[in-house]
Amino acid sequence: GAFKISTEGAGAWASSATMNTATYGGRGIGTTTALVGAGGDGSDDKNTETYNGTAWTTETALNTGHYIAGSFGASSTSAMMASGYDAPINVVDVEEWNGSAWTEKANVNTARRGGGGAGIVTAGLIFGGYSTGIVAICESWNGSAWTETADLNTAQEDIFQGIGTQTASQCVGPPTENETFNGTSWSEQAE
């Protein structure tokens, strides 16, 4: 056999403005404009900041702490934070961001933290995480209610975050887990 060599264009990292509040365990949505919410464990776990491509702005805080929540959305004006941790417990609470405020939505079925999320505010998923142990549970959001769907093949927590849509998602978690969802089932991918 022969090897085929290909090259890809290289990208470059650049510095940008610093967030107003130091955070860890927060979840983000977006690309050049972004939203970060729920960073920090304890008093900071309700923080929300948006990024306009140049600077960060402190926004209305979440109603409930969602540290290491499952998050998904399309932009800095349309996002969801689902479940997560608000010391000392995992929470079932879900909130939707409309660009200026958080609104409580229907609760998830299983409280967990460290799970992933994918999709938009009217069609999303949260998957994996830690409940009373590491879980493979996947729940689907239709804009008004949560339904448990096909579980991940491998229970995972501290998921790096999900990407994609409700019917075409990818879950990447430590140390080398990689699964895709086609709207019906999860499939293991090369790690």
Where in this protein do the model-derived segments appear?
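Polar, enzyme-active/binding microenvironments
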Residues: 1-191
